[in-house]
Regions:
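The alpha/beta-hydrolase serine catalytic core
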Residues: 1-87, 92, 97-100, 104-110, ...
Length: 118
């Protein structure tokens, strides 16, 4: 459901034809290009999760940038809802982007990972 909403439905007809024909299309995002395969799109359609429930009592931590233009924060909130555990949290990094790769954001990610491991 994510890939259709966030990618496929935004592709032009030309892009859809190309990815079906070649099996891959390169999407430009900022200074980088990312290969998106048609297999990824098909797998996303087969593996829908938002209508499922995960009942294991496990710790779940999701980290998301508030300024993520690729995947809006609402999707992390939706995914978090499928976990029935009471030990779940969403950490929204203020002004964080999709990659969360700045030193400041990496420090937050490292802190959250340490909390999970310990």
């Amino acid at each position: 459901e994510f890939l259709d909403k966030l990618m496929w439905n935004k592709f032009s007809n030309k892009m859809k034809i190309e990815i079906k024909k070649k099996g891959v299309i390169n999407l430009k995002h900022g200074d980088y290009e990312y290969p998106i395969t048609y297999q990824l799109i098909k797998d996303g359609r087969k593996n829908k999760i938002l209508n499922k429930k995960i009942s294991q009592n496990i710790n779940v931590t999701m980290v998301h940038g508030s300024k993520d233009k690729s995947v809006p924060v609402i999707y992390s909130k939706k995914v978090l809802k499928i976990f029935q555990s009471k030990k779940k949290k969403l950490v929204v990094i203020k002004n964080g982007d999709h990659s969360l790769s700045s030193p400041k954001w990496l420090k937050i990610l490292k802190k959250e990972l340490k909390l999970i491991i310990n």
